[in-house]
Amino acid sequence: MLSVIAVNQNPVANPAAIVTSGYMRFTVLTPEIIRIERSTLKKFEDRASFVVINRNLPVPTFTSAEKDGYLTITTDKLSLRYKIDSNPAVNDPCNPNLQITMNLNGEPVIWYPNKKDPYNLKGTTRTLDNAEGDVRSWLEDGLISRSGWAVIDEQKAR
């Protein structure tokens, strides 16, 4: 017997949770999760992905402000800082144009695009056929990390 669970799918976020700046759209999904998108056509993706099927969540408390050429979005858990009209994919780790600062066990942790995460606990593998030895090198980054942050690339999850 096959049982089916109905899930309310509403991938379009509440407009009150969205902050746009030029080619960028930031969606504050929870105090700990900000969805970051860039589109030179300013056409953003609202379809569900395999990872996220519902983005219409209660809007968390946050503030956003533009000052001195930067957009800042702050929740009680993190602070995002974006250099307005810059491309986050072209980023200098010493002076990132997009960064998120959060607190992990009383210490500040900073994330920026393309930052390597040596403490990611990795995802899963489809099969162990022909596996020999350590299979961790096969695994992509997962949703949990000892670094205090993880990145989900929804472009690859459609």
Where are these regions (language model features)?
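Generic low-complexity segments that are intrinsically disordered, proline-rich and/or Lys/Arg-biased
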Residues: 12, 16, 59-61, 109, ...
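Short Pro/Gly-enriched beta-strand edge/turn motifs at strand-loop
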Residues: 8, 53-57, 123-126
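Short, exposed beta-strand/loop patches in secreted or surface proteins that constitute
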Residues: 8, 17-19, 25-27, 59-66, ...
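N-terminal-proximal low-complexity accessory segments that begin disordered
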Residues: 12-38
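Generic low-polarity alpha-helical segments
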Residues: 1-3, 19, 90, 151
